[in-house]
């Protein structure tokens, strides 16, 4: 069962908003044979120009579903988020079931009703073009540096992320450029 943690920023989450979110995103449960025990973290933020930003993160056992949408209409934004999440689940479902079929394992996801199967087949054909294909591989040594040096190196190379060995912790870390133009840091733990 998917539980919901819904937080509003500059907005009071009414029962109507809560029910709409739970109804729409709760429909994702139909894609699973065993409904995962998961918590959907939903953050709704309104801006001064009345635009809303909806972020949904659902951490599952082997994958994290995440979608973000900005829209002037809160309910339309929730619908768009739901479509994005469904697309992610279908894509993941196709990969997992294909891999399991090759191994002879039981399918982890539920079969959809027949009317949905036709849509699923069409989507699978479109997604076949989007198969993961690694077209280039690089090998390089990680240099010890701090996060500031890594950001400078990343900007110098014109990349969106940079992997390095943290001089202080001796662990592998990643700096990345966020959508808002600021920087993020991912540190590994053992």
Curated annotation (Swiss-Prot):
In Gene Ontology terms, what is a biological process of this protein?
Answer: negative regulation of translational elongation
Q: Which GO-annotated molecular functions does the record name?
A: ribosomal small subunit binding
Q: Which InterPro entries match?
A: HPF/YfiA_ribosome-assoc (IPR050574), HPF_long/plastid (IPR034694), RHF-like (IPR036567), RHF/RaiA (IPR003489), Ribosom_S30AE_C (IPR032528), Ribosom_S30AE_C_sf (IPR038416)
Primary site of residence: cytoplasm
Q: Is Cytoplasm tagged as a keyword?
A: yes
What are its GO cellular component terms? cytosolic small ribosomal subunit
Q: Which CDD domains match?
A: RaiA
Provide the protein's localization.
Cytoplasm
HAMAP family in the cross-refs: HPF (MF_00839)
Q: What is the documented function of this protein? A: Required for dimerization of active 70S ribosomes into 100S ribosomes in stationary phase; 100S ribosomes are translationally inactive and sometimes present during exponential growth.
Name recorded for this polypeptide: Ribosome hibernation promotion factor
What gene does this protein come from? hpf
